[in-house]
Curated annotation (Swiss-Prot):
GO cellular component terms listed in the entry, alphabetical order: chromatin; cytoplasm; mitochondrial intermembrane space; nucleus
Protein name: Mitogen-activated protein kinase HOG1
Species name: Yarrowia lipolytica (strain CLIB 122 / E 150) (Yeast)
Enzyme class: transferase
One Pfam family from the record: Pkinase
Activity control, per UniProt: Activated by tyrosine and threonine phosphorylation.
Entry keyword annotation includes Ubl conjugation: no
Gene: HOG1
Domain Protein kinase as annotated: residue spans: 20-299
Length: 386
């Protein structure tokens, strides 16, 4: 059994295995505190994220389970990679990933970026998104602080705590306001992978300008300043608004014409302007995809169709509609952690014994119960439609 060491970080107890030393706080991620550390096993620097109260409520448990499953499934050069995971004696969950030196937010705070760096960073973001979207996943919270960069300018997208299934029925208030797509504000219900493209367009503009493109003070101001630059949304987009209150608000705004982005970004390359215009489109159906953006002339110096992979299989979202108690989510997480560490058999080829065996069996039973409930629900819906 692993030895655990307790350390206080920002008044928070970090309880980690003795494998990791030299803890230093890095910052807060989505729903967790992040520290840098030294992995004595590999002699590499790593980031350790403590998930706050993973078993506090069913919602928090499900969110943690979702992030764990995503980190296990999504394996790509431009996505943060999970190297270890463990549950402490206090039942806190810790994700261990590679450590990158900084993030895009901090980089933009220090100095303007030169063209070749903007191109390379944008290329890597889109390369990662092409893979993520092909797996049937929407990140939902892309922003400069969720984009990590090392000294070689290698870039990795992190914080999949809010990521969701590609779906036409999603709940609304998720991404950081400055980078939030208009369809999230307009409909609060229906959106898909295109929200990540909008966020990327905002990040692209921020790399060019050195400051946020749409720094809204609140929800209303955010949408208003978007229309000041991009003009009023077209009628076919307005007709998709589900909320009566939102529809009334949009109708009260003065009619505005689109301002050419070239007049705002006077020093930008025309090809950069063209790509940004294809990203920052009100109608998500007309927004450029990640794969299409990679093939845009602006990214020609880096574009290589043979080295821009898609996911081998789509992510399994079968758990996503499950309404399960904390204890069930807990045993399912234990099972995922055992699977990550390949704790299926012992050194003699025998099934796991004791607690591991019990947890594994409980998790399998919980999953089977959930799948059976979903099957009954689908059967009932089919009968009602007949």
């Amino acid at each position: 059994m692993a030895d655990f060491i307790r350390t206080q970080i920002f008044g928070t107890c970090f309880e980690i295995t003795s494998r990791y030393v030299d803890l230093n706080p890095v910052g807060m991620g989505a729903f967790g505190l992040v520290c840098s550390a030294k992995d004595q096993l590999t002699d590499q620097n790593v980031a350790i994220k403590k998930i706050m109260k993973p078993f506090g409520t069913p919602v928090l448990s499900k969110r943690t389970y979702r992030e764990l499953k995503l980190l296990k499934h999504l394996r790509h050069e431009n996505l943060i990679c999970l190297s270890d995971i463990f549950i402490s004696p206090l039942e806190d969950i810790y994700f261990v990933t590679e450590l990158l030196g900084t993030d895009l937010h901090r980089l933009l705070m220090t100095r303007p970026l030169e063209k070749q760096f903007i191109q390379y960073f944008l290329y890597q973001i889109l390369r990662g998104l092409k893979y993520v979207h092909s797996a049937g996943v929407v990140h939902r919270d892309l922003k400069p602080s969720n984009i990590l960069v090392n000294e070689n300018c290698d870039l990795k997208i992190c914080d999949f705590g809010l990521a969701r299934i590609q779906d036409t029925q999603m709940t609304g208030y998720v991404s950081t306001r400055y980078y939030r797509a208009p369809e999230i504000m307009l409909t609060w219900q229906k959106y898909d992978v295109e929200v990540d493209i909008w966020s990327t367009g905002c990040i692209f503009a921020e790399m060019l300008e050195g400051k946020p493109l749409f720094p809204g003070k609140d929800h209303v101001h955010q949408f208003s300043i978007i229309t000041e630059l991009l003009g009023s949304p077209p009628e076919d987009v307005i007709h998709t608004i589900c909320s009566e209150n939102t529809l009334r608000f949009v109708r009260t705004l003065p009619r505005r014409e689109r301002i050419p982005l070239a007049s705002k970004f006077r020093n930008a390359d025309p090809e950069a302007i063209d790509l940004m215009e294809k990203m920052l489109v009100f109608d998500p159906k007309k927004r450029i995809t990640a794969a299409e953006a990679l093939a845009h002339p602006y990214l020609a110096p880096y574009h290589d169709p043979s080295d821009e992979p898609v996911a081998e299989e789509r992510f399994d979202w079968s758990f996503n509609d499950a309404d399960l108690p904390v204890d069930t989510w807990k045993v399912m997480m234990y099972s995922e952690i055992l699977d990550f560490h390949n704790v299926d058999i012992d050194v003699n080829g025998q099934p796991p014994q004791g607690q591991f065996e019990q947890v594994h069996a409980q998790a399998q039973a919980a999953v089977a119960q959930n799948e059976a409930a979903r099957a009954r629900e689908q059967e009932q819906q089919q009968q009602e439609q007949q």
